[in-house]
Regions:
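Sec/Tat signal peptide C-region and signal peptidase I cleavage site
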Residues: 19-24
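Solvent-exposed, acidic/polar segments of extracytosolic/periplasmic ligand-binding ectodomains
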Residues: 28, 347-423
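Extracytoplasmic "Venus flytrap"
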Residues: 31-52, 72-79, 101-102, 170-178, ...
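Beta-alpha junction/loop-to-helix N-cap segments that form part of ligand/metal-binding clefts
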Residues: 42-47, 57, 61-133, 143, ...
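Venus flytrap/periplasmic-binding-protein-like
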Residues: 74, 122-130, 203-204, 244-266, ...
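Extracellular/periplasmic Venus flytrap/periplasmic-binding protein
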Residues: 80-83, 129-132, 138-242, 281, ...
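Periplasmic-binding protein-like
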Residues: 88, 92-102, 120-124, 166-171, ...
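Extracellular/periplasmic periplasmic-binding protein-like sensory domains
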Residues: 137, 238-319, 329-333, 385-386, ...
């Protein structure tokens, strides 16, 4: 009798384990990191909205399996990004990692990915140039352009159309905004433009008084490479100090993470020229459909405090997740042999994204279209970016040969030099 009970009990346990195993096999675990704390919280929240739109667009399935999402929070620092990635990869055992959001995080996650060759990492939205250009990881894929690519066309537009010949810059002191200023300077300076002062501020700066006092008066415009709470704090304090210079915006200075902020300080951005991988008022039907899907989501979860329209972070996370899900569909969820088929599908993908066609170069870095924009107030009274120019097929070296591009140096506080020609 006892032996029979033991056999029955063992059979029940075996059946339960088999059932759990089969249930797990019906799911694909996707790990996602986002800046859900600190200066860039609003950016991380909108990134997650973009991710959720991609899950919805694929009916919650990829490669014939149900998508299970595990989210880990970061604060935009490299250490927090690696901690989050380690949890997802080493504890939660995710199948694919979509990470991270911010520039310095990207370099750290690239390096971490080299220690975990069994996992494929798809960049969420980070935009430092070094992430994919310097010693790239063979398992790291980026479907968004970097910060320099996101400024293609801006230098030409401010010099030749707006007639700004001398500018100063204020930007956050880290890899992404180094890359943004790098892209702006290369184009603007070759045309004859001058950057008379470059000011760098730490992420999370609360008091901009000394920075504002250091701004030169004899410039045609000031470039602002700020984001999130930093952008809003600067605008408030700049207006209180009586600042009235013409402004040029970085990619996350003039998207909905700032244009939808509370208060009147954002009004100073009306007329601001900027450049980015998207534009709020892009007339492209695919973009309009994407924006509508964002706007009509139920106001719950991440969408409870959604913006009037998707930001650069939303479209970047959407595209990254969409690429993952499409590649998984293509290989029918096959992640065997160190993701070989899956990675081949990612590498060769032509992503017909809401913000234009995206392909990858030899370093698995995005090539796509860039949008030069101007901030306007629309018929609803919302601030939005309208398209004034589109630059297609923007590659990471910005038209330079590898030899010349490498001689210019990596983006930094003083790189590139502002000059009319580069070796």
């Amino acid at each position: 009798m006892r032996k029979g009970l033991l056999l029955a009990s063992a059979a029940s346990v075996f059946a339960l384990l088999a059932s759990l195993s089969a249930h797990a096999a019906d799911k694909i675990k996707i790990g996602v990191t986002a800046t859900l704390e600190g200066t860039y919280t609003v950016l991380g929240e909108d990134g997650m909205r973009g991710y959720e739109l991609a899950v919805k667009a694929h009916d919650g399935k990829a490669g014939g399996k149900e998508i299970e999402t595990i989210v880990a929070s970061t604060d935009a620092s490299p250490d927090s990004a690696v901690r989050a990635a380690k949890k997802l990869v080493e504890q939660d055992k995710v199948d694919v990692l979509i990470s991270p959001l911010s520039g310095a995080e990207g370099i750290a996650i690239r390096d971490y990915s080299k220690t975990q060759p069994q996992i494929t990492v798809i960049n969420a939205s980070s935009g430092a140039l070094e992430t994919t250009y310097v010693d790239p990881s063979p398992t790291f894929y980026r479907y968004n352009m970097d910060g320099a690519q996101w400024h293609a066309g801006l230098g030409d537009y401010i010099y030749n159309t707006k007639h700004y010949k001398k500018i100063a810059t204020v930007a956050e002191d880290y890899a992404f905004t180094y890359t943004q200023v790098f892209g702006l300077a290369l184009e603007f300076c070759q045309l004859g433009g001058q950057i008379t002062k470059r000011l760098w501020v730490p992420l999370g700066t609360k008091d901009f008084a000394s920075t504002i006092a250091s701004l030169p008066d004899d410039v045609d415009a000031i470039y602002l490479g700020l984001g999130g709470a930093d952008a809003v704090n600067f605008l408030n304090q700049y207006q209180q100090a009586g600042g009235n210079a013409k402004l040029i915006g970085g990619s996350i200075m003039v998207d909905q993470t700032v244009l939808s902020s509370k208060g009147k300080a954002k009004e100073a951005l009306i007329g601001t020229v900027a450049a980015s991988g998207m534009a709020d008022a892009d007339p492209n039907p695919k973009w309009q459909a994407f924006a509508k899907s964002y706007q009509t989501m139920p106001k719950e979860g991440y969408f409870k405090n959604a913006f009037p329209g998707p930001s650069l972070l939303a479209i970047s996370y959407y595209n990254s997740a969409d690429a993952v899900f499409k590649a998984l569909d293509q290989v029918k969820g096959d992640l065997s042999d160190d993701n070989k088929k899956f990675r081949e599908a990612l590498k060769n993908m032509v992503l017909d994204a809401p913000n234009g066609k995206i392909t990858l170069d030899e370093n698995r870095q995005a090539i796509g279209s860039n949008f030069v924009t101007e901030v306007i107030k629309d018929e609803k009274g919302d601030l939005v970016s309208k398209v004034v120019k589109i630059v297609p097929n923007v590659q990471q070296r910005l038209g330079f040969s590898k030899e010349v591009f490498d001689k210019i140096g990596l983006p930094g506080r003083d790189v590139p030099e502002c000059k009319k020609s580069y070796p």
